[in-house]
C-alpha cells in the first residue's frame, strides 16, 4: 500500500468541534436518524458527499476577486466558456447553478412522457429528473457491476447488447438520448472505458440517437483510462478527455465535483435547436445566459478549477487517497465494493450487517452507527435511495447493491484523518452485531433520502462513549 503524499500546502485551516457520543445520539434522534438533517458543525469527518465540499486553491480564490458582476456579458463568462470548449469541445456552453438544473433543463426540453432514457446507472437527481417528465430511467450497466467482489477495471461500462435490445424494443423514436455517467457513482465510482464509449457511439450512430455524458467526475474517469486502458498510459489526461467527449453530443456537469468549486455547473451541447430551447428556459428559471444563476466570481473560480483538476499530480493524489482508505479497510477484512472507486469507498452493508434485512435499511443503519460512535458522516446508497414500490403488488423492490458511500472531499482532509476513518470502521466492524435496523416513519414522494425519518427497531449500544 502506497502512502499518498499531498501535492499541496495548507494555507487556511478551519477548526473542527469535537462532540461526545451522547451529543451525537441526541442529534440523531432529533434528525429522525437521517444524516442529511444533522448539523455539519457537529460532524468530525464529513464524507456525506464530495459535491461542493472541496477546498479551492489560492489561484481560484484570487479569481474570486476578479469577479465581473455585470448582468450581461460578464468577462468571467467568456473565460469560462473558452475553458469549457477547450476541454469538452461542444458548441454551446450554458451555465447553471449546479448539475441538477442542467439535467432539468435538458430533460424538460427533450424528454416527453412515455419515453425512456438509458444510462449505465442513473444517479438520484438524474433519475428523478427523467421520471419527473413521466419517462423511464433505465439502468443498463454490465452485470459485473452488481458483484461487489468482481475486480474488472471498467465496471462502469454500459451493456451494449442490452442497449441495442432496448433500442429495438422501445424504438429509437422513444429514446431522445442515451446518458453515460462518468464515473459511475451509483455503481461504486467505477470508470467507463474509452472502448466502451467508442462502441456506444458507433451503436447509436446507426439509428441515430444522441449520446450525452453526466460528466461531473470526468477527470477521475480519464485518469483511470490512463492507468488501466491499453494505449493511453503516455497520453495527457487533457488529451484523453478531449477524445472521450468527441464521441458525445453534449454533457451535463456538476462542477461541484471535478470543477473543484462549491457551487456551479453547466450544460454543453452541439444541437442548435435544443440549445435555443434550453436557453429560453434558462432565462425563465435561472437567469441571463452569461451568468446562469451564478455570480461572475463563481464562473471564474469554476473556469480555473476545470483547468486545475486535469493536473496529473493532483489526480494521482486524489485517486491515491481514496485507494489508501479502501486498502486499509480491505486489509482488515471489512467488506467493501471492489475495485476501489475514484471519489469514494463504498462499504458493503449486506455483508457488514448480514443480520439486518434490506427491508430494515442496513446501509442507513450502518451510516447511523458510524456517526453515533465516531462522528463520521457517510451516505446510504441502497434501499432508501433507490428502492422502488411495485405498482401491482405494492411491495418494495430492493436494489442489488446496499452500500454506505464514504465520499472524500477534494484537498480537504489529511491522511491522518483518513486513517482515523479507517480505524473507526474497523473497530465498528468488530462489534457489528450490536447494530440494529431502522423502520421508516416518513418519506417524500421523490428523492426521499433527503428528508426521510426513521425509528430504531432496538436501542443501539456501544462498548464505550467515544468523543472525537
Predicted regions and their residues:
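Conserved small-domain helix->loop->beta segment predominantly found in fold-type I
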Residues: 290-368, 372-400, 436-446, 467
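Conserved PLP-enzyme active-site core in the AAT-like
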Residues: 2-33, 37-39, 43-55, 60, ...
Amino acid at each position: 500500500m502506497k502512502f499518498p503524499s499531498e501535492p499541496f500546502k495548507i494555507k487556511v485551516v478551519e477548526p473542527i468541534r469535537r462532540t461526545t457520543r451522547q451529543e451525537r445520539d441526541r442529534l440523531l434522534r432529533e434528525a429522525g436518524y437521517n444524516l442529511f438533517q444533522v448539523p455539519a458543525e457537529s460532524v468530525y469527518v464529513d464524507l456525506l458527499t464530495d459535491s461542493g465540499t472541496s477546498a479551492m486553491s489560492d489561484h481560484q480564490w484570487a479569481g474570486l476577486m476578479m469577479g465581473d458582476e455585470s448582468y450581461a456579458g460578464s468577462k468571467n463568462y467568456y473565460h469560462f466558456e473558452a475553458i469549457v470548449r477547450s476541454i469538452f469541445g461542444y458548441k454551446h456552453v450554458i451555465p447553471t447553478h449546479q448539475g441538477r438544473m442542467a439535467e432539468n433543463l435538458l430533460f424538460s426540453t427533450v424528454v416527453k412522457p412515455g419515453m425512456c432514457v438509458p444510462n449505465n446507472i442513473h444517479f438520484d437527481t438524474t433519475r428523478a429528473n427523467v421520471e419527473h417528465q413521466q419517462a423511464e430511467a433505465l439502468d443498463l450497466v454490465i452485470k459485473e457491476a452488481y458483484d461487489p467482489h468482481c475486480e474488472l477495471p471498467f465496471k462502469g461500462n454500459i451493456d451494449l447488447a442490452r442497449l441495442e435490445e432496448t433500442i429495438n424494443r422501445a424504438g429509437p423514436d422513444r429514446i431522445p438520448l442515451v446518458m453515460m455517467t462518468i464515473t459511475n457513482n451509483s455503481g461504486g465510482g467505477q470508470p467507463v472505458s474509452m472502448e466502451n464509449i467508442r462502441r456506444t457511439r458507433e451503436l447509436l450512430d446507426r439509428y441515430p440517437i444522441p449520446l450525452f455524458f453526466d460528466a461531473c467526475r470526468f477527470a477521475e474517469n480519464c485518469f483511470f483510462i490512463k492507468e488501466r486502458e491499453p494505449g493511453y498510459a503516455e497520453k495527457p489526461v487533457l488529451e484523453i478527455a478531449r477524445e472521450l467527449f468527441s464521441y458525445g453530443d453534449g454533457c451535463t456537469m456538476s462542477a461541484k465535483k471535478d470543477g473543484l468549486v462549491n457551487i456551479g455547473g453547466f450544460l454543453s451541447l452541439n444541437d442548435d435547436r435544443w440549445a435555443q430551447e434550453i436557453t429560453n428556459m434558462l432565462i425563465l428559471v435561472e437567469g441571463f445566459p452569461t451568468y446562469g444563476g451564478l455570480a461572475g466570481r463563481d464562473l471564474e473560480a469554476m473556469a480555473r478549477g476545470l483547468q486545475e483538476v486535469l493536473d496529473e499530480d493532483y489526480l494521482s493524489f486524489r485517486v491515491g487517497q481514496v485507494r489508501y482508505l479502501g486498502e486499509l479497510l480491505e486489509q482488515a477484512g471489512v467488506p467493501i465494493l471492489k475495485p476501489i472507486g475514484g471519489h469514494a469507498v463504498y462499504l458493503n452493508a449486506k455483508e457488514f450487517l448480514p443480520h439486518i434485512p434490506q427491508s430494515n435499511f442496513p446501509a442507513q443503519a450502518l451510516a447511523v452507527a458510524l456517526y453515533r460512535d465516531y462522528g463520521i458522516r457517510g451516505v446510504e446508497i441502497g434501499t432508501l435511495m433507490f428502492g422502488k414500490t411495485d405498482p401491482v403488488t405494492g411491495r418494495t423492490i430492493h436494489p442489488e447493491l446496499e452500500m454506505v458511500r464514504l465520499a472524500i472531499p477534494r484537498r480537504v482532509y489529511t491522511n491522518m484523518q483518513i486513517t482515523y476513518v479507517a480505524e473507526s470502521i474497523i473497530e465498528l466492524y468488530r462489534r457489528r452485531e450490536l447494530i440494529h435496523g431502522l423502520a421508516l416513519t416518513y418519506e417524500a414522494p421523490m428523492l426521499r433520502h433527503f428528508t426521510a425519518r426513521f425509528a430504531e427497531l432496538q436501542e443501539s449500544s456501544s462498548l464505550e462513549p467515544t468523543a472525537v
